[in-house]
UniProtKB/Swiss-Prot annotation:
It comes from the Eukaryota. This is Cuticle protein 67, isoform A. It comes from Locusta migratoria (Migratory locust). PANTHER family: LARVAL/PUPAL CUTICLE PROTEIN H1C-LIKE PROTEIN-RELATED, PUPAL CUTICLE PROTEIN C1B-LIKE PROTEIN. GO terms for molecular function: structural constituent of cuticle. Keywords: Cuticle, Repeat. The tetrapeptide (A-A-P-[AV]) repeats found throughout the protein are also present in many proteins constituting the protective envelope of other species. Transmembrane segments: none annotated. Component of the cuticle of migratory locust which contains more than 100 different structural proteins.
């Protein structure tokens, strides 16, 4: 038989669920990345050009970083000689007498 009035249901239909469901991490959009680096040296390793590039692409944005460096040791050594010679005073600047 019937035992008294209605009992309160164990689950109220209007209540918010205790667990909120979110998309699993596997469904997140993928990001594509790439990077490269190169070094080009001259004959005798007197100068070099080095490049580095990194790219990150997502469905929402794209970022690229680049770095290019040029060095030339030959110019550095020629620009600052260890011993400098000066012209004799007679040839340095002509003097005019009136």
């Amino acid at each position: 038989g019937y035992l008294g009035g209605y009992a309160a249901p164990a689950l109220a239909y209007g209540a918010a669920p205790a667990v909120a469901y979110a998309a699993p991490a596997a469904y997140a959009p993928a990001a594509l990345t790439s990077q490269s680096s190169n070094i080009l040296r001259s004959y005798g390793n007197l100068g070099q050009v080095s490049t580095y590039t990194k790219t990150v692409d997502t469905p929402y944005s794209s970022v690229t970083k680049s770095d290019v460096r040029v060095s030339n040791d030959a110019i550095a050594h020629v620009a600052a000689p260890a011993l400098a010679y000066a012209a004799p005073a007679a040839y340095a600047a002509p003097a005019y007498y009136h």
